[in-house]
């Protein structure tokens, strides 16, 4: 399919692969042939990726300071660059799109050397290292939270938002229904593995400190690590609080839609899903996140009025008890927060990302694309 091929490149984690998969679906629906370049580890769980072909490209990280390890990493990336150049020469893609992670460096760098239009998508409000290295060279930057009007690359940045799952789009149709003064109050608590561990300690204790009249209103859904699941469930049972505790929820989107309040970490996907569905949140950024990207992501929602940020070191059980007590007594405030969160949601992120991809593939500049979009 000469001239109608797009090459996508994503690092070997779900966080990088998911937005690439969402774009692939959208591009294929528009008649494009889609290929994926990734590292060997990702090929194990990219079997359902909607690509005409998946290409394993050599790559490596520079996590070690050992000279031999650095040399080995450099050689792997050089091999990946040569492989990527050969792949681009064969496929002749109209554009190459990267989604972060070190495995994107060889294909994107090779594309810029071959003067193929290039785009990187950054999920977070702070650029990751691979995207930051590529930013000066690429044609365009699509951002989940990156501003279009500020920063060294603002002139070629388009705020597309982050693609979300179809289940999230479906859940976004559920309007927020505030809890009445004495009615059931549904609290959803979730996070990554470390997030679930911390919340497993502090949330049950905060609930214990609540007045009995408020505890009786609570219905809690909480993610917990397998080793914490039993103790967390027992803690709620002892308090007489109805709770559903599990290491994983396959229907998380509908759980968010059912919640009156969400307590969570603030990874890019989490913040994007909360915003699209439109629910008030207490966000606790993971304190050890690289480049503090979770804090920056949370700020985007807080600035809109849809969330309150509490650093982990300040989230004591007593502090959380106070936040819950205020929230349970302020249904109008929570409804306003839900509306504010939804106002910054981007349910059309996949479509916008495909629009930018097609624009650069046709030779259009970001400035021209923005002008056309605003006309």
UniProtKB/Swiss-Prot annotation:
Known catalytic reactions: di-trans,octa-cis-undecaprenyl diphospho-N-acetyl-alpha-D-muramoyl-L-alanyl-D-glutamyl-meso-2,6-diaminopimeloyl-D-alanyl-D-alanine + UDP-N-acetyl-alpha-D-glucosamine = di-trans,octa-cis-undecaprenyl diphospho-[N-acetyl-alpha-D-glucosaminyl-(1->4)]-N-acetyl-alpha-D-muramoyl-L-alanyl-D-glutamyl-meso-2,6-diaminopimeloyl-D-alanyl-D-alanine + UDP + H(+)
Biological processes per GO annotation: carbohydrate metabolic process; cell division; cell wall organization; lipid glycosylation; peptidoglycan biosynthetic process; regulation of cell shape
Ligand binding (UDP-N-acetyl-alpha-D-glucosamine): 13-15, 124, 165, 193, 294
Known pathway: Cell wall biogenesis; peptidoglycan biosynthesis
Pfam family, one: Glyco_tran_28_C
Extent of the signal sequence: none
Membrane topology: Peripheral membrane protein
Keywords: Cell cycle, Cell division, Cell inner membrane, Cell membrane, Cell shape, Cell wall biogenesis/degradation, Glycosyltransferase, Membrane, Peptidoglycan synthesis, Transferase
Record-stated family: Belongs to the glycosyltransferase 28 family. MurG subfamily.
Protein name: UDP-N-acetylglucosamine--N-acetylmuramyl-(pentapeptide) pyrophosphoryl-undecaprenol N-acetylglucosamine transferase
Source taxonomy: Bacteria, Pseudomonadati, Pseudomonadota, Alphaproteobacteria, Hyphomicrobiales
Gene: murG
């Amino acid at each position: 399919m000469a001239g109608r091929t797009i090459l996508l490149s994503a690092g070997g984690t779900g966080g990088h692969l998911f937005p690439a998969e969402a774009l692939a679906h959208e591009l294929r629906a528009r008649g494009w042939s889609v290929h994926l370049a990734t590292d060997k580890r990702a090929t194990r769980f990219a079997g359902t990726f909607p690509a005409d072909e998946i290409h394993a490209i050599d790559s490596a990280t520079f996590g070690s300071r050992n000279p031999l390890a650095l040399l080995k990493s450099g050689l792997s990336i050089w091999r990946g660059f040569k492989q990527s150049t050969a792949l681009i020469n064969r496929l002749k893609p109209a554009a190459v799109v990267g989604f972060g992670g070190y495995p994107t460096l060889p294909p994107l760098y090779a594309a810029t050397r071959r003067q193929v239009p290039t785009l990187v998508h950054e999920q977070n409000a702070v650029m990751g290292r691979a995207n930051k290295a590529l930013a000066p060279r690429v044609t365009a930057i699509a951002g989940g939270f990156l501003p279009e009007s500020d920063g060294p690359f603002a002139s070629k940045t388009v705020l597309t938002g982050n693609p979300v799952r179809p289940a999230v789009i479906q859940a976004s149709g559920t309007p927020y229904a505030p809890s009445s003064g004495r009615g059931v109050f549904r609290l959803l608590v979730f996070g990554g593995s470390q997030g679930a561990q911390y919340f497993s300690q502090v949330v049950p204790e905060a609930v214990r400190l609540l007045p009995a009249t408020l505890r009786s209103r609570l219905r809690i859904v909480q993610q917990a690590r397998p080793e914490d699941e039993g103790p967390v469930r027992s803690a709620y049972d002892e308090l007489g609080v109805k709770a559903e505790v599990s290491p994983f929820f396959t229907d998380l989107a509908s759980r968010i839609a059912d919640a009156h309040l969400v307590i969570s970490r603030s990874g890019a996907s989490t913040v994007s899903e909360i915003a699209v569905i439109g629910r008030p949140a207490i966000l606790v950024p993971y304190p050890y996140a690289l480049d503090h990207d979770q804090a920056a992501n949370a700020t985007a929602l807080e600035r809109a009025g849809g969330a309150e940020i509490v650093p982990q070191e300040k989230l004591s059980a007593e502090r959380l008890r106070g936040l819950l007590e205020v929230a349970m007594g302020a249904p109008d405030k929570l409804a306003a927060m839900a509306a504010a969160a939804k106002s910054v949601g981007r349910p059309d992120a996949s479509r916008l990302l495909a629009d930018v991809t097609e624009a650069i593939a046709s030779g259009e500049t970001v400035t021209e694309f923005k002008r056309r979009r605003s006309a």
